[in-house]
């Protein structure tokens, strides 16, 4: 739950940075910027899914426990899809962040789709769900893939988007990953981080 919360809260902060842009030929035309962004979560199987993570998703409104069916009209369910627009976020420390005013520090509405696959079919199958299912319907300009636990830096998603927007011949891009060193670099004591 901490890893998913860290990533989702970082994404929502990045969307806030995009919404707060004052000068933009793309984001400020044809409606609010947040309406041009969709966050898709794909979880690989109900059984391996951490129940505390589902509680976090229920807290922000994207998951509803008790509405899933194992089969419909005798056919086994392949995936459960939830859709919701929320301004709620949960930090990695499990603090609930709510909208407080219309100021620049308030998180904007974020359109979310959550696909919980019935069976664990591995990561590549999850990518296929994103590109073949959601991608065909949404027809996005770009897709940014993040693993749970990855915290996008300040304006990092905007920087990735700008790379594609400014170069129509660009086919792929990647960000830079930094280890989270912790306060006073205390995480360097852990040999896996160091």
UniProtKB/Swiss-Prot annotation:
Q: Which GO terms describe its cellular component?
A: cell septum; plasma membrane
Q: Where in the cell is it found?
A: Cell membrane
- Tell me which Gene Ontology terms the entry assigns under biological process: cell wall organization; chitin biosynthetic process
The top EC class is transferase
Keywords for this entry?
Answer: Cell membrane, Cell wall biogenesis/degradation, Glycosyltransferase, Membrane, Transferase, Transmembrane
Q: What is its EC number?
A: 2.4.1.16
UniProt membrane topology term: Multi-pass membrane protein
Q: Could you give a GO molecular-function term held by this entry?
A: chitin synthase activity
Query: InterPro entries from the xrefs?
Result: Chitin_synth, Chitin_synth_fun
The record's catalysed reaction(s) read:
[(1->4)-N-acetyl-beta-D-glucosaminyl](n) + UDP-N-acetyl-alpha-D-glucosamine = [(1->4)-N-acetyl-beta-D-glucosaminyl](n+1) + UDP + H(+)
Taken from the record, one Pfam family name reads Chitin_synth_1
Primary location: membrane
**Role this protein plays:** Polymerizes chitin, a structural polymer of the cell wall and septum, by transferring the sugar moiety of UDP-GlcNAc to the non-reducing end of the growing chitin polymer.
Q: What family does the Swiss-Prot or TrEMBL record give for this protein?
A: Belongs to the chitin synthase family. Class III subfamily.
Full protein name = Chitin synthase 2
Organism (species)? Ajellomyces capsulatus (Darling's disease fungus)
Q: What is the lineage of its organism?
A: Eukaryota, Fungi, Dikarya, Ascomycota, Pezizomycotina
